[in-house]
Each structure stands twice: as C-alpha cells, then as structure tokens.
Amino acid sequence: MEYKFDREWILEPIGGDTGQAYVGYNDANDERVFLKRNSSPLLTILSMEGFAPKLKWTKRESSGDIMTAQDWVYGNVLSHFEVAQLPVVKLMYRYHHSDNLYNMLVKIDGDVYEPERFLQDYQSNLSKELRNHHFLTCVENCLWDTRHLVDGARKTVCHGDLNRRNFIRAEDNQLYLVDWEMVKIADPILDISQLLVQYVDFKNWDAWFDLYGLRITYDIYQRIEWYSMLNLLNMIKKDYQENRMMAMNHKILKLKHIYNNRYLQQVGEM
C-alpha cells in the first residue's frame, strides 16, 4: 500500500519489527531512498563511519516524528554461513572499539546496561508458561546468583540485535549493519555471544575468538557463558511470543548444552 509523504515522495512500507520503515520513491528525480521514522539518534555518526548507509536528509513531521532518509542499498542480507565469517567479525570489532561512536552515545545519554538490568528486562512481560518452566527458571536463577562475576566489565557500544537480516552487503561489497534501535552501552560480550549462539557451531567458537582477537581468560569465559545463556533466554521468550515453537525448542536444547557444561556452576559453588 502506497501513500503520499509530501509532494515529492511516495512511501511504501517494508518489513520490520517497528513498522516504521519505508521505501521512498521520487518519480521526478527517479530516486529511491530508505526512509525510517524515529531511527537511532546515532544515525549521523553511523553513516559517517561507514557502519550504516549514507544519511541523505532528515525531516520533522507535523506530528513531531523525525523521518530520516538514507541511500537505498542494492545488495543482499547475509546468509547464516556468511554472518560467521571474517567481514562481520571485523565490522563488530570496529564499532566495539569506535571512540567516536561511544562518545556520541554517552553524549546523548544512551542506555547503560549492567547484568541486573538485562535480567529485569527478561522478566518484564514474561509469560506465565515460561515463568513456570522449571529449566528456564533454573537458568535464570543461575544468572541472578552469578551476576556479580560478570559485573563491572569494560563497556562499549553494543548493537543489541545481531540478526543476520540486519547485515547487508551492497553490490560494491560494502558491509553495513542496520536497525540500531536497541543500541546500548554494555559489555561487548553481549553482542559477541548473541551472534555465536545463533550462527556459530560450538566447535568453532575458539576460531571465531581468534578472528576477533579475543584472548580467552577465566573472566572472559565466565562472561561468554553468562551472556550466552541470557541471550538464549531472550530469544526463547521472543519465539514463544511469536508462536515459533520449533525454533524455541531448538534454542532450549542449545541452552541446556551450555547450562549443563557451564564453568559458572563450579564458581557459584565455591
């Protein structure tokens, strides 16, 4: 369904969790752009540093909403296999270590997350069925009991929604990461483990760490376990909300593997 944005632009909604994204057509100039309502305030610097497609303009609507326009990128979303490869690792490393991005997020009072806040978010709007699920409750209790072991880690900019569909490779081979609405200041292991539990086999995690340049210590290993279990809990919660039971059960099996073999179990009993 198309509708007029102003005299120049016709908008057509495209898929997305927010329902605020559009393809914008300007027939007079034969131009196409990606339009989004109330996108991340980081968009300007994300565009400048090459993490996101070029920002073309912004416009305030009569409602007070801000509409942003970016270059329309002709390309493809990454496959399950491609997300685990070196270009994505390099991109993640760059934004995790970008002082400009971090300083801007601090300047605009970006959300700062400690382990306790992540657990509070998980509990928010959690269904009765999942609250009463014995195994998931055991995992959650483990995370509460061991949160002090992962607290106080160095924080960076974290994307927070590393789904393969948010990685776009343009026709010129430029790799972009889009949908920064869940960006936060947190332990970068949040992002790393989020990607690992979705797209990298357990047997290949060490090789992935080498690509990223992550030297595994006991401290880092505990954080990887903790955030891997947290991310899987959140994914299970979302699968349940969206009635994806097969996907949910697959993640529960993955979570059981991590939980039953966890180092945190030994630490928590000391």
Indicate residue ranges for each PLM-predicted region.
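A glycine-centered beta->alpha junction motif in the catalytic cores
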Residues: E61-F81, P115-S127, M229-M245
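An alpha-helical support segment within catalytic cores of ATP-dependent transferases
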Residues: E2-F5, N100-G160, R262-Q266
